[in-house]
Structure formats: structure tokens, C-alpha cells
């Protein structure tokens, strides 16, 4: 399926955020917070020097972070660790409930199909840009990684007819499915978020589950996906990254403007949802919760949603 949209790879634009996530996972693996042995070699394969140094520990948080700043490399690593634990547990809970079909939307450098202990008979579909999946497939082959589920790559842009591409790979909408939208929704325009959730709903049998990361900052403003407060939190961090040779503006990559609340939207369509603030995930992992000194909202106020289809 050929897309007419702008494309990117794992070293540029939105694709670089997938490499950033893997770098954070690699760093968190060294502390025992998570276990992703594929994260570091995948980051190395992409070849962004800054991200490789982050992943390996050659670049310490103290080298980059600004004392007293709300967010820095250490806080970003903690966020990604807590987020990874949440989605790992989500898939584990779904498997325990008997779900044997899973879909990872915008999978990037996600290696759950190779590192999680999936029950026998589980089919895992990974959806992402063709170049991204081709790169990851080659890298995992070079690493001699063995899948722990039946992994099926669905190479399609989420702005195109991805449900058709998913069905073409053998997806069965009559079976309960575990869906994940990790680090995805803030990058979608508000109307595209609704279309994605509608498509997931139409493809989901009773008992299906969806886990999603929901960014509250910027959801009701025109100040970028992070909102004015979120951008203010991250700008010192991103400025230091630029000094070390890596230039990425997370606010520019997302989509701002009023959008429907994910939990409310899903519940109106037959799902029952539970939200967990990022702050609670950090606290449960024994990690510091970053809070601005002036008490304004921050990234810690974003939430994670798990919804079950009735």
C-alpha cells in the first residue's frame, strides 16, 4: 500500500522519538526497572550519536541536566521506564484474561514481540511505517532475536487505510484483542485521534482491551501538543540536547487544539475505562515525581488509560 504522506525514518522527525524511547528503555534496563535487552543494540543500529550515548550511559544525566529544572534526562528516563512497565503489565493482564491477539500501533523500536513471555498461540501485529519496520526487522535478525509470539509486521501509515492492511495480515476482528497506543495520540490531530479510536472500536470484539497514553497538556490550547506549560518544562532540556548535537522540538511534532478526552470518548462507545496519572506510575516504581515549583500543571499530570470493550 503506497502512502502519499510525508515520511520519516528513525533518525528524523517523529521517528527520532521512537529512538529516544528505546534509548530511555535501554538506560532504565541498566537499573533493573525494566528488562529490554534489545533496546540498546537497536539504538546503536539507528546511529544517532546522542541517543547511543544516552542508551549506553556514556552520557550521564549530570552532563546534560540543569540543576533545579523540572524535567531532564533522568526524569525522561524515569518517565519512559514507568510507561514501559505500564504497557508491559497491560499485555500481561490481557494474556492472563485469555486474549491471544494483540496490536501495537506505531510500534517503532518496540521489542515486546521478542522480550515478553507471551502465551502459546498469541499473534502480535505491529503497525508502523514500512521503512521503520524493515529497519527493525533487519536489526533484530542481525541480533538473532527469536520472537516469543507470532509477530506479523503491518507496514502501513496510520494516516492510510490501516484496518484493511491489518485484516490482510490475518487479523481476526471476532477475537478479543489487546491494543496499545503508546506515545501516539499526542502526535495525531484531534480528528485523527477520533478516527483511530473509532476504527479500534469497530475492529474490537467484546473483551478487547486498549491501553493508551493521554497527554492533557495542549489538549485544549493552540500552544502545541505539550501546551504552553509542557513546552516551558521541556525547553531547557531540549536546549541542552541541542548543545550536545541533537536537535528535536517535541512540541512542533505534536498536534494541538481542543480534542475529545480519550476515556470519555471510549466510554460513550461501549468501553469501560480506568485512568492512572503518570505521577501514580512514577510513585509506584519508587521514582521521583517531577513537579514545577510554582504548582502549575506538568507532564506528570498526563494519564494512562486502560479500557475494556463490553
UniProtKB/Swiss-Prot annotation:
It comes from the Bacteria. It holds the Pfam family LCM. InterPro entries: Ppm1/Ppm2/Tcmp, SAM-dependent_MTases_sf, SAM_mthyl_Trfase_ML2640-like. One of its GO terms (molecular function) is methyltransferase activity. GO terms for biological process: methylation. Keywords: Methyltransferase, S-adenosyl-L-methionine, Transferase. S-adenosyl-L-methionine binds at residues 128, 157-158. The keyword Electron transport does not apply. Its EC number is 2.1.1.-. Belongs to the UPF0677 family. Exhibits S-adenosyl-L-methionine-dependent methyltransferase activity. NCBIfam families: mthyl_TIGR00027 (TIGR00027). PANTHER family: S-ADENOSYL-L-METHIONINE-DEPENDENT METHYLTRANSFERASE YKTD-RELATED, S-ADENOSYL-L-METHIONINE-DEPENDENT METHYLTRANSFERASES SUPERFAMILY PROTEIN. This is Putative S-adenosyl-L-methionine-dependent methyltransferase MSMEG_1888/MSMEI_1848.
Amino acid at each position: 500500500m503506497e502512502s502519499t504522506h510525508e515520511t520519516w525514518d528513525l533518525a528524523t522527525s517523529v521517528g527520532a522519538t521512537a529512538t529516544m524511547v528505546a534509548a530511555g528503555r535501554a538506560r532504565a534496563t541498566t537499573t533493573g526497572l525494566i528488562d529490554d535487552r534489545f533496546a540498546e543494540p537497536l539504538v546503536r543500529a539507528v546511529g544517532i550519536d546522542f541517543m547511543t550515548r544516552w542508551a549506553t550511559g556514556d552520557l550521564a544525566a549530570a552532563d546534560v541536566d540543569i540543576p533545579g529544572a523540572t524535567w531532564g534526562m533522568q526524569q525522561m528516563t524515569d518517565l519512559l521506564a514507568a510507561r514501559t512497565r505500564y504497557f508491559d503489565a497491560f499485555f500481561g493482564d490481557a494474556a492472563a484474561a485469555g486474549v491471544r491477539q494483540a496490536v501495537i500501533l506505531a510500534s517503532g523500536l518496540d521489542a515486546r514481540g521478542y522480550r515478553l513471555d507471551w502465551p502459546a498461540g498469541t499473534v502480535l501485529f505491529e503497525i508502523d511505517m514500512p521503512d521503520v519496520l524493515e529497519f527493525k526487522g533487519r536489526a533484530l535478525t542481525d541480533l538473532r532475536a527469536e520472537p516469543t509470539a507470532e509477530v506479523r509486521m503491518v507496514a502501513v501509515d496510520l494516516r492510510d487505510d490501516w484496518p484493511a492492511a491489518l485484516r490482510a495480515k490475518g487479523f481476526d476482528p471476532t477475537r478479543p484483542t489487546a491494543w496499545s497506543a503508546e506515545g501516539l495520540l499526542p502526535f495525531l490531530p484531534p480528528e485523527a485521534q477520533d478516527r483511530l479510536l473509532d476504527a479500534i472500536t469497530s475492529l474490537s470484539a467484546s473483551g478487547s482491551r486498549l491501553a493508551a497514553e493521554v497527554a492533557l497538556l495542549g489538549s485544549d490550547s493552540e500552544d502545541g501538543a505539550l501546551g504552553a506549560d509542557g513546552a516551558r518544562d521541556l525547553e531547557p532540556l531540549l536546549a541542552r540536547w541541542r548543545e550536545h548535537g541533537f536537535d528535536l522540538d517535541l512540541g512542533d511534532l505534536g498536534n494541538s487544539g481542543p480534542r475529545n478526552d480519550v476515556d470519555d470518548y471510549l466510554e460513550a462507545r461501549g468501553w469501560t475505562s480506568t485512568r492512572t496519572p503518570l505521577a501514580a506510575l512514577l510513585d509506584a516504581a519508587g521514582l521521583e515525581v517531577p513537579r514545577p515549583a510554582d504548582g502549575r500543571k506538568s507532564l506528570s499530570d498526563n494519564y494512562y488509560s486502560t479500557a475494556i470493550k463490553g
